[in-house]
């Protein structure tokens, strides 16, 4: 199993969620990338349930994504709903 996201998948996510052509760091893109990393790490932990170091990293990523989504919900509610639906995560 590889570490993190492969560059093609990352580029694909950036293309889908970017606001303009040069956008790579907007909240929308960051949430999408974090969600992909969280999904990848969740699959890893199903295979390796005693990998506590990775589990802690997962919890930190989930917390970071939660904070970003909270900010997005407050500042851009329509974009928040759209991202929640696209990524299939609870809001």
UniProtKB/Swiss-Prot annotation:
Keywords: Ribonucleoprotein, Ribosomal protein, RNA-binding, rRNA-binding. GO terms for cellular component: cytosolic small ribosomal subunit. This is Small ribosomal subunit protein uS15. Belongs to the universal ribosomal protein uS15 family. It comes from Petrotoga mobilis (strain DSM 10674 / SJ95). It comes from the Bacteria. One of the primary rRNA binding proteins, it binds directly to 16S rRNA where it helps nucleate assembly of the platform of the 30S subunit by binding and bridging several RNA helices of the 16S rRNA. NCBIfam families: S15_bact. The lineage of its organism: Bacteria, Thermotogati, Thermotogota, Thermotogae, Petrotogales. The gene is rpsO. Part of the 30S ribosomal subunit. Forms a bridge to the 50S subunit in the 70S ribosome, contacting the 23S rRNA. Pfam families: Ribosomal_S15. GO terms for molecular function: rRNA binding; structural constituent of ribosome. CDD domains: Ribosomal_S15p_S13e. One of its GO terms (biological process) is translation.
